[in-house]
Design a protein with these regions (language model features):
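Short amphipathic alpha-helical segments
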Residues: 17-19, 48-49, 81-85, 127, ...
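Phosphate-bearing ligand-interacting subdomains
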Residues: 41-102
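Short active-site oxyanion
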Residues: 3-4, 32-34, 66-69
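NAD(P)-binding Rossmann-fold cofactor-contacting core
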Residues: 23-46
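Short hydrophobic segments within beta-strands
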Residues: 6-7, 37, 72, 152, ...
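Short alpha-helical
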Residues: 11-14, 42, 77-78, 108, ...
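Glycine-rich adenosine-cofactor-binding loop
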Residues: 2-21
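Structural signal for interior beta-strand "rungs" in well-ordered beta-sheet cores
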Residues: 95-211
């Protein structure tokens, strides 16, 4: 049996824990939840819920033979940062897939990724490692999501659409078929992307246009 450590005990970490103990793998006894890794030892103080313990900071943890990990960081850059720390220690990662998700048997989901409930992953979709697909997302056929990508709730990606590494599509955003967004891109909530988007840009609106902060 494997022992899951969730890296991050803040809001997303708690949501990941709630999902992890409802997966079929957990119910089948494939793993237990050993605890959280977080530098803030009192991150769970004062909260309702029966949470596993915060063991120590990720940087201080020594990987054990039956350990598996999930990086529960909402920001892609921090997800990548801590994934690389754990990987350098020899750690291995688990993907968490909610039972209510609809996933085509031809889809590929990279290690350490999260597929939330009621999302639809269509034919020949490829999702990279440590990516997040939130509630009620619809990924059309042949869609590609890069490593550390984030697709927030109620978003839609048409056939052959592509999302680059460390990019985020915020709530209810749309990427129409055959269009691509590059690496480190942010698409604002409710935006409709109708053209390719280059690396590092922030776009917002319908149709989505470049914005500067």
């Amino acid at each position: 049996m494997k022992h899951l450590l969730i890296v991050g005990a803040r809001g997303w970490g708690r949501e990941v824990y709630a999902a992890a103990i409802k997966t079929q793998a957990y119910l089948d006894g494939e793993y237990t939840v050993k605890g959280f890794l977080d530098s803030k030892q009192d991150a769970l103080a004062g909260l309702r819920g029966d949470y596993p313990p915060i063991i120590c900071a990720p940087e201080d943890y020594e990987v054990q033979p039956d350990d598996i990990f999930f990086i529960a960081m909402g920001e892609p850059k921090w997800r990548k940062h801590y994934a690389e720390i754990i990987e350098a220690k020899g750690g291995h990662f688990i993907s968490i897939i909610c039972k209510s998700a609809s996933i085509n048997k031809t889809a590929i989901i990279g290690e350490g990724s999260f597929i939330s409930g009621w999302s639809c992953i269509s034919d020949n979709v490829h999702i990279g490692k440590h990516a997040i697909v939130h509630l009620f997302c619809d990924l059309g056929h042949d869609v590609k999501i890069g490593n550390y990508g984030t697709i927030e709730a109620y978003s839609f990606l048409g056939g052959y659409a592509e999302v680059g590494e460390c990019s985020t599509m915020h709530v209810r955003s749309t990427l129409i078929r055959h269009k691509k967004i590059g690496n480190n891109v942010e698409v604002g909530s409710s935006s409709v992307v109708m053209r390719n988007v280059k690396d590092g840009l922030h776009v917002f609106g319908n149709p989505a246009k470049i914005i500067n902060f």
